[in-house]
Amino acid sequence: MVKHQPLQYYEPQLCLSCLTGIYGCRWKRYQRSHDDTTKWERLWFLILTSSFFLTLVWFYFWWEVHNDYNEINWFLYNRMGYWSDWSIPILVTTAAGFTYITVLLILALCHIAVGQQMNLHWLHKIGLMTTLITTVVTMSSIAQLWDDEWEMVFISLQATAPFLHIGALAAVTALSWLIAGQFARMEKATSQMLMVTAYLAVVVALYLVPLTISSPCIMEKKALGPKPAIIGHRGAPMLAPENTLMSFQKAVEQKIYGVQADVILSYDGVPFLMHDKTLRRTTNVEEVFPGRAYEHSSMFNWTDLEMLNAGEWFLRNDPFWTAGSLSRSDYLEAANQSVCKLADMLEVIKDNTSLILNFQDLPPDHPYYTSYINITLKTILASGIQQQAVMWLPDTERQLVRQIAPAFQQTSGLKLDAERLREKGIVKLNLRYTKVTNEDVRDYMAANLSVNLYTVNEPWLYSILWCTGVPSVTSDSSHVLRKVPFPIWLMPPDEYRLIWITSDLISFIIIVGVFIFQNYHNDQWRLGSIRTYNPEQIMLSAAVRRSSRDVKIMKEKLIFSEINNGVETTDELSLCSENGYANEMVTPTDHRDTRLRMN
């Protein structure tokens, strides 16, 4: 019986197999190659890199607009006709796409690091293009439908830019190992210069980025102004259904500065609270009056409005994901809320709470179309609330309002020059936080005009506005913001400059050290680390990438070895690369008939 022994045994390379297998479905040794990556695959790598940065921006955008998720859902509700929480599915999908692209990019960079030829599998190419196209379409849709929300990105950078800069600096510094390794192995000086120039341009740009960073929270602690007052948006809509009596009771319990309410008149002249033009979103009108669900809310008599439930929708749709945290008693109370009269709300808040009133325009055929201002004023004055506590927002009949209630704070929702506002008798502005800059706030304050910004729900945004000097904000999450004792971060300018310069110096030292080490290590490998060669190693070695010059040297040494010594056997051949990867070969101990042949 003849016993056959293998000429060679290659130790398994599990990590390398997983790397090339996941990226290009090349799990076997013979499927891998250290040849140069084709131009087609380089194009796919460029697409992959571009997709990474695009999905990074989109993921950052969607994470930061968490402040406005409810507004986004309400906006889509008005366009689509039904309520659904679109924010979380979009966030989850965006996070999944970003994670997928990031993993592919890391695998591609690992291919470069170990000298493997990149060959992205066709399934990944489909997934990459699907993710890219979906992201582009979604971003374009948001830009067209809600371009105002992109201002949120620039505002958020005031809070995150100093930290994003350090993170980007760490990432680019870490890439120096890969760049330096490629630089050391390149044979053409032109290619080396192009690579180093491009890399250094990125590094220098990052070093200088702090010159463009402007954040109001980079300031001395003693210059920090008072904490902005908090106004509950439609009461406390995270703790109770919006514009209901329970919502305003919860707001008063929070001991906040004021509340905001949306007022409209019923068909028989009773002022009540409702934000939408119809009753579909916040009541069960489709069950009680199915034929009138799309009618304007002002076309219902008060006796009809009293029949509607205004709380079940809150528990069913859970717009702020807070319904599950309600106590048993609050849950039952919320389920039984009804449409709220203006007079009932005023009775709850009249003692120590300010009020911003917003009005809906009535249809022209409404019986009180021309007199609803008078009716509302009578209701407010009859409640006993102090006139100084009322911020009057509608531009309609301002002169009449001044005559009847001269102490009302005349408030405007329009961004105009301070001089024009003063001429109109405006003392307060109520604007969306994306509509004003830090300079606008300071100019208005210098002109003795108070500014209230809406809708501010996140502590980081509240902190930025606090550092800016905003006097008050309107919020859905008053119970959260009232517990913010201090801006999330506040840094003196000298301290920030010290962190900036120190980070740049550390990065520079690491980059220079990496380039020196990689060049020294590569020179040592070329001069003395190559001991013996085997043609099978040249063909099958997949752990490292060697230049054509290195492969030529190995082949020449093998040929001269056979000429000088004849056909010999070797006990063990081992080749280590400059990257630290070993492709070891073990031969049998019985060498009687073993021969190495060159084809």
Swiss-Prot record:
<comment type="function">
    <text>Glycerophosphodiester phosphodiesterase that promotes cell cycle exit and drives spinal motor neuron differentiation. Mediates the cleavage of glycosylphosphatidylinositol (GPI) anchor of target proteins: removes the GPI-anchor of RECK, leading to release RECK from the plasma membrane. May contribute to the osmotic regulation of cellular glycerophosphocholine.</text>
</comment>
<keyword id="KW-0966">Cell projection</keyword>
<keyword id="KW-0378">Hydrolase</keyword>
<feature type="glycosylation site" description="N-linked (GlcNAc...) asparagine">
    <location>
        <position position="374"/>
    </location>
</feature>
<feature type="glycosylation site" description="N-linked (GlcNAc...) asparagine">
    <location>
        <position position="448"/>
    </location>
</feature>
<feature type="transmembrane region" description="Helical">
    <location>
        <begin position="88"/>
        <end position="108"/>
    </location>
</feature>
<feature type="topological domain" description="Cytoplasmic">
    <location>
        <begin position="182"/>
        <end position="192"/>
    </location>
</feature>
<dbReference type="GO" id="GO:0005886">
    <property type="term" value="C:plasma membrane"/>
</dbReference>
<keyword id="KW-0963">Cytoplasm</keyword>
<dbReference type="InterPro" id="IPR017946">
    <property type="entry name" value="PLC-like_Pdiesterase_TIM-brl"/>
</dbReference>
<feature type="glycosylation site" description="N-linked (GlcNAc...) asparagine">
    <location>
        <position position="352"/>
    </location>
</feature>
<dbReference type="GO" id="GO:0006629">
    <property type="term" value="P:lipid metabolic process"/>
</dbReference>
<feature type="disulfide bond">
    <location>
        <begin position="15"/>
        <end position="18"/>
    </location>
</feature>
<feature type="disulfide bond">
    <location>
        <begin position="25"/>
        <end position="576"/>
    </location>
</feature>
<dbReference type="Pfam" id="PF03009">
    <property type="entry name" value="GDPD"/>
</dbReference>
<keyword id="KW-0472">Membrane</keyword>
<feature type="transmembrane region" description="Helical">
    <location>
        <begin position="193"/>
        <end position="213"/>
    </location>
</feature>
<keyword id="KW-1133">Transmembrane helix</keyword>
<feature type="transmembrane region" description="Helical">
    <location>
        <begin position="126"/>
        <end position="146"/>
    </location>
</feature>
<feature type="glycosylation site" description="N-linked (GlcNAc...) asparagine">
    <location>
        <position position="336"/>
    </location>
</feature>
<keyword id="KW-0812">Transmembrane</keyword>
<dbReference type="InterPro" id="IPR030395">
    <property type="entry name" value="GP_PDE_dom"/>
</dbReference>
<feature type="topological domain" description="Extracellular">
    <location>
        <begin position="214"/>
        <end position="497"/>
    </location>
</feature>
<keyword id="KW-0325">Glycoprotein</keyword>
<feature type="domain" description="GP-PDE">
    <location>
        <begin position="228"/>
        <end position="485"/>
    </location>
</feature>
<keyword id="KW-1015">Disulfide bond</keyword>
<keyword id="KW-0524">Neurogenesis</keyword>
<dbReference type="GO" id="GO:0008889">
    <property type="term" value="F:glycerophosphodiester phosphodiesterase activity"/>
</dbReference>
<dbReference type="GO" id="GO:0048471">
    <property type="term" value="C:perinuclear region of cytoplasm"/>
</dbReference>
<dbReference type="GO" id="GO:0004435">
    <property type="term" value="F:phosphatidylinositol-4,5-bisphosphate phospholipase C activity"/>
</dbReference>
<keyword id="KW-0443">Lipid metabolism</keyword>
<protein>
    <recommendedName>
        <fullName>Glycerophosphodiester phosphodiesterase domain-containing protein 5</fullName>
        <ecNumber>3.1.4.2</ecNumber>
        <ecNumber>3.1.4.11</ecNumber>
    </recommendedName>
</protein>
<comment type="similarity">
    <text>Belongs to the glycerophosphoryl diester phosphodiesterase family.</text>
</comment>
<feature type="topological domain" description="Extracellular">
    <location>
        <begin position="64"/>
        <end position="87"/>
    </location>
</feature>
<feature type="topological domain" description="Extracellular">
    <location>
        <begin position="147"/>
        <end position="160"/>
    </location>
</feature>
<feature type="topological domain" description="Cytoplasmic">
    <location>
        <begin position="1"/>
        <end position="42"/>
    </location>
</feature>
<comment type="subunit">
    <text>Interacts with PRDX1; forms a mixed-disulfide with PRDX1, leading to disrupt intramolecular disulfide bond between Cys-25 and Cys-576.</text>
</comment>
<feature type="transmembrane region" description="Helical">
    <location>
        <begin position="498"/>
        <end position="518"/>
    </location>
</feature>
<dbReference type="GO" id="GO:0045666">
    <property type="term" value="P:positive regulation of neuron differentiation"/>
</dbReference>
<feature type="topological domain" description="Cytoplasmic">
    <location>
        <begin position="109"/>
        <end position="125"/>
    </location>
</feature>
<dbReference type="GO" id="GO:0047389">
    <property type="term" value="F:glycerophosphocholine phosphodiesterase activity"/>
</dbReference>
<dbReference type="GO" id="GO:0007399">
    <property type="term" value="P:nervous system development"/>
</dbReference>
